[in-house]
């Protein structure tokens, strides 16, 4: 079983050195090959033959690798790079496609596993409708990977023996397409009956494409107690489209576990479930900043990045409270944002503790961070530019950081707004901006924006709060 230790999938921060070895010179010391090969010494003859075989084999391998890369790029999924293929940054990842773009589909708040008695339209039929949303969105987009950004399940209703079957169901559309994916976990994935570490292990070892290759990048790179650290804290490197089998590092995708929910298989003295803090732990933030700085130092430059976390940071609520113009942040704005750092009593009366301040500070200080993407709040799906000081928030100024919400993707969970997924497209030649939109279940597009230096000032059409049909 994979252990949850710091650096489980850590990069090697050393430059790859050349391998020394004897070089054979095919010179005039040996008579012309065509007529006098047999006159050469046995050692030299073997050297010539060996060099020919090695050269031919390497040529075939390189050509085959290029063919596989082009074929994978053509069908959508970016090729997976294994250890030893990432140039000076030796860490498995994905790469920009042949069209020099990297496209991510994000599904959030799928909430599989809710029983029929929880409400009208819930139960197994709702789960299959959720899978239908995923299929519809993926059929409309040409994605290189999928991010499942938390609350894959409503696991408070799921028996322990059924957890892996739920994960199989939610990843079925990805298996069908041989689609690489990564997950963060949400507060509804952490319950007394469900362990997100069991989910992660199942994804890692058992979710494979139709070609038999593993699809999941979901892992844990930070050690510590489950209720403090969570599970889904890790990163994925995205390599350049050029460079054959030795491309350079172009971008990083960061994943964070904001926890929440209930502790696994634990109860208090009264037999009640034990709540788990709903924010990214400071130890995880320290791992992030140390790893980020080490990568940048090793590469000798700032590596652009994206980040994914289920529960949004408090800055989103502070921004919402400032009542921004809907034409500068197009999207649903149908509920008050629930965010990291809230502490709630037994009657669900909550107050902000500031516990995500260290995490927000680290995000703001991360050069090249193009955007942070969250779910959790089913009635919000806009992107904000954190360029001005926000009251009652620390840090006050976000240095232009983009914070985005995903669309509620599942028919489980609350809300009746139209379901969909967020699409994120980054161009290899424009690693300072993002193009993003919501692809709705019916195939239409909502809230198409460009997150660049003028986002937050540019004006876009407002987004209609459309409802899902058949509820």
Where are these regions (language model features)?
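Extended active-site neighborhood of metal-dependent phosphoesterases/phosphodiesterases
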Residues: 80-96, 166-300
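Active-site environment of divalent metal-dependent phosphoester hydrolases
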Residues: 113-116, 154-157, 183-195, 262-264, ...
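Fungal secretory targeting signals
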Residues: 55, 61-79
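N-terminal active-site segment of His-dependent metallophosphoesterases
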Residues: 76-170
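His/acidic metal-ligating clusters that form di-metal
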Residues: 141-144, 252-255, 267-381
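Binuclear metal-dependent phosphoesterase catalytic core
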Residues: 80, 238, 253, 380-471
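Active-site-proximal beta-strand elements of phosphoester/diester hydrolases
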Residues: 101-114, 250-260, 264, 308, ...
